[in-house]
């Protein structure tokens, strides 16, 4: 199959805009007449420093990042933040609040327990992580050093539709699977972070946006590469950053601006998700897994109710160019990730394929 015949519904690493890949391919051997690939450039070279500064400025503009916050381009994946956050924001004996609404928030809370007292402010685990708690369900600790939540749960297909009110306690949010898909008031957050491999760039880059007031209080035992203050002081270049991924993020941000920015993405994501959810709600074979009020626009989870039929559908879809629809091993079923670069045509093809499969099963 050719690229135009395939739609990639992977939860991450995920689909990138074809236009971005074409630009990267054209510049691969000779970036802007430098005679070098970006892959070969010194991170201290003028060429790369210009790429770095431009990408940072584009992200600041795209998310309207206030001057109180610093943008960091880090390594280690979003999972490294599970440790980095408590090491930098707490002292031994401090209390923190965690909302456990999915697998990754659960892992983050367990990791934080190594460093401080974790209070579970909310959990949907008993319900199979199929819903997001309402504000009035949150049990908040007034002495908490921060409140942590994961905005979009890729595995279970749920998303927070609101920013929690915490009474002034700094909010830390994992936005890995929804960043750049809608406007965000960054000023409400102490830390926003995201692994880039879902909506931003290839795997290998982690973006952290931090209120500078929260930095500089890390524990003495904090590894030097895990100090927010050190990375702020060195402008993310204490060591060699993931240079090519930063360049790719810049290209994605150029593409994003042409699509109307995050406001344009919000309209697109809602329209794409509606196409799929509308079909799921009328289907006699397939059904959605998440509670309607908590449904994610980025990751749509669904199943038939029979594991064998689910597997048959995944194979049926693959033969028609629809890739990576198998659900996460923790949840099973199917999952369609509708990130920014997924065109509406891909969702329409998926719905058509689901209808064809359903008709064959005479339901």
Predicted segment positions?
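Conserved N-terminal alpha-helix of the aminotransferase class I/II PLP-enzyme fold
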Residues: 34-81, 88, 103, 111
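PLP-dependent enzyme catalytic core of the Aspartate aminotransferase-like
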Residues: 1, 6, 319, 332-363
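Conserved PLP-binding catalytic core of the aspartate aminotransferase-like
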Residues: 286-316
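Active-site phosphate-binding strand-loop segment of PLP-dependent enzymes
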Residues: 112, 124-179
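Conserved active-site segment immediately N-terminal to the catalytic lysine
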Residues: 172, 186-197
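Active-site C-terminal subdomain of aminotransferase-like
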Residues: 196-277, 291, 361-363
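A glycine-/small-polar-enriched, mobile loop at the entrance of the PLP active site in fold-type I
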Residues: 5-56
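PLP-dependent aminotransferase-like
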Residues: 79-145
């Amino acid at each position: 199959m050719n690229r135009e015949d395939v739609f990639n519904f992977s939860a991450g690493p995920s689909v990138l805009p074809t236009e971005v890949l074409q630009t990267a391919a054209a510049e691969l051997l000779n970036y802007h007449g430098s005679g070098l690939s970006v892959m070969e450039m010194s991170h201290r070279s003028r060429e790369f420093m210009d790429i770095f500064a431009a990408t940072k400025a584009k992200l600041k503009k795209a998310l309207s990042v206030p001057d109180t916050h610093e943008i960091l381009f880090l390594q280690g994946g979003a999972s490294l933040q599970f440790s980095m956050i408590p090491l930098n924001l707490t002292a031994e004996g401090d209390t923190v609040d965690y909302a456990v609404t999915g697998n990754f928030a659960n892992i983050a809370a367990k990791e934080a327990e190594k460093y401080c007292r974790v209070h579970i402010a909310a959990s949907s685990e008993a319900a199979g992580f199929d819903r997001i708690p309402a504000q009035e369900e949150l049990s908040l600790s007034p002495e908490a050093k921060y409140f942590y939540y994961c905005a979009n749960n890729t595995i279970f297909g749920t998303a927070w539709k609101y920013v929690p009110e915490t009474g002034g306690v700094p909010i830390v949010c994992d936005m890995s699977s929804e960043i750049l898909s809608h406007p965000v008031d960054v000023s409400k957050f102490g830390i926003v972070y995201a692994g880039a491999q879902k909506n931003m760039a290839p795997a290998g880059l982690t973006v952290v946006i931090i209120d500078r007031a929260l930095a500089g209080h890390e524990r003495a035992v904090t590894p030097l590469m895990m100090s927010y203050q050190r990375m702020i002081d060195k402008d993310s270049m204490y060591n060699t950053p993931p240079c090519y991924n930063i360049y790719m993020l810049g290209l994605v941000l150029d593409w994003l601006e042409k699509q109307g920015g995050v406001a344009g993405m919000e309209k697109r994501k809602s329209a794409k998700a509606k196409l799929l959810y509308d079909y799921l709600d009328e289907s006699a074979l397939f059904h959605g897994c998440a509670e309607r009020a908590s449904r994610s626009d980025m990751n749509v989870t669904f199943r038939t109710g029979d594991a064998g039929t689910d597997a048959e559908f995944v194979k049926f879809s693959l033969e028609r160019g629809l890739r990576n629809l198998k659900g996460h091993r923790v949840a099973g079923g199917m999952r369609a990730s509708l990130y920014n670069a997924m065109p509406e045509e891909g969702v329409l093809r998926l719905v058509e394929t689901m209808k064809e499969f359903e008709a064959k099963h005479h339901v």
